[in-house]
Amino acid sequence: LSIIGSSGSGKTTLLRCMNFLEHPEEGQILVNGQLLFDASRPGTLTDAQLRENRLHFGLVFQSFNLFPQYNVLDNCTLAPDLLARDKAKAEGRPFDKAAAHKANVEKAETLLARVGLGAKLKNYPCELSGGQQQRVAIARALALEPDILCFDEPTSALDPELTNEVLRVIKGLKSADTTMVIVTHEMEFARHVSDHVIFMADGVIEEEGDPEQIFT
């Protein structure tokens, strides 16, 4: 699903509502038939419910948001390590920190190789190009195994020559049947990679349909 529209049309706000970073005033959020949010129901979600709901979504920001003090591999294992610890605690079972970390390292190495960065595991963000940093951000989001991977203008902070390497990774994810929601200004990319397109204006979905309907 691609979300297109001019600046200020509400694209990023919609994405933030989906990821529970903003509180929607109307509507529902369902994932795989599971109701995560209903604005018509009184009360607010607890912090624990918000954390649980956010795990359904991975979010790749336009500005990478990598931790500068950690290398590439550590950027991709930090959140899964914490999640494994919290899950063990919630289930009332012992937490094997070493075993969990080993499994998360193996997963991260596989994902980083998938995005073409298998040789950069020990590098720090400052040693990478913008395109490489964005690919690390994609691998980091995938490490949490979200149901839906969201992108907020994933190429807007990149020089034109670095844009294609990120778009190639996203196309590869599409080929692997990864469910994605992409806010983008790359119209040709949206046309060719999307199964469904939403056009927004003034905070409202003005039009939606398959790419042929929207772009003709």
Outline where the language-model segments fall.
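ABC ATPase "signature
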Residues: E208-G209
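Conserved signature/switch motifs of ABC ATPase nucleotide-binding domains
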Residues: N123, L144, A176
